[in-house]
Amino acid sequence: MTASALVAVLCVGVMPMTRVGRARERGETQGFMKVLVDAQTERILGASLLCIEGDEIVHSLLDVMAAGASYRVVQRAVHIHPTVSELIPTLLGQLVPLPPLPPLPPLPPVPPVPPLQA
């Protein structure tokens, strides 16, 4: 397998808490929600939930990750209103591709190992 075959196309969705009605209602608009998705498999690779109710939101994302299911499962789910987690479908609907990383420089040669002394 070549190195280029190992490169995944990643997508990211970010939502500031200033756009979340429940957070505005509580006056806790600091922070954000961010999700990283493999575009080819549609699997959620990770999330950063630096926000109010992040400890509750994470469970729906973890369930989809543990099941190896597509992010579309949680995107299409019915979320209760008014909650912070009701914005997960909107967050996942805003996924955009990340630019590819530059190639890594070649590794330096490995020096020879001296023979063992008896």
For each feature predicted by the language model, list its residue ranges.
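Flexible, glycine-rich terminal cap/loop adjacent to redox cofactors
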Residues: 4-118
